[in-house]
């Protein structure tokens, strides 16, 4: 969330929140956190208090930490399933923030808060007459490594969206997590406000947390965690080999092949197909997640000037298949999918 909108790898203030839960810790059981008290709280760089906001019993989270505070629900755990919660933010004007008001729910988090993924809301952005700011109403981050700034610069408007939400009032949130995909639904809508297909973290399960921003008041109530059957996803798939790639972009479809080799975290290889022949690929691998780049040749007959262009791919490999996002700088954006070529 802008220079102080969200974290840049700086340690978060973490609060370990102990609450009563229904069948807490039992795999396959629903966990309910009413959040009407703060018994057993260990607060660091954040403060939790029982409160009423607009007549609803809740927990109020405040923090003076520049990059916000996180409260982990003790005993919570989810791989795949849904998280529901009521949340609200009392907006103030932290220094340097153009549109104040941040609050969110973290998932698949480490108990110490050192790694997590999160959807967060920015209700005042939804009221802006600047469409660019309106498109930042709901955002996704994965920390460490994939904060708002990096995701927005590398993949504009893919990890954030507009939503019809209001500041200083309760919002009902539901997050659906399935494998490497997560969706957020707001205020009972059956249509997601944001879909992240290709979650950035290799954490496949973890705790649920509450997040608030410096200088503001975030309120949380009625967290309900409902597990579902886990998707058959695993980490560590190798990218090495030959892959047949299909790229569905806003400039039309493209096809090609990648021949990749891997040495530790380093990936090299070649691309051949619609965007050029024997183009040198370079990039990185982490637990099956790759970020690759190669110099492309933009063809005649497509929107945009023909000629040299830079192509970028990111995504996950899962044994015999792979998928993610791809862009050709200044020319096209979309999703790619690949199948391993069997010789």
Please give the residue ranges for each predicted region.
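N-terminal secretory signal peptides that target proteins for export/translocation
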Residues: 1-8
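Short stretches within intrinsically disordered, low-complexity N-terminal or propeptide regions
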Residues: 5, 23-25, 48, 73, ...
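Central antiparallel beta-sheet cores of small beta-barrel/beta-sandwich binding domains
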Residues: 234-343
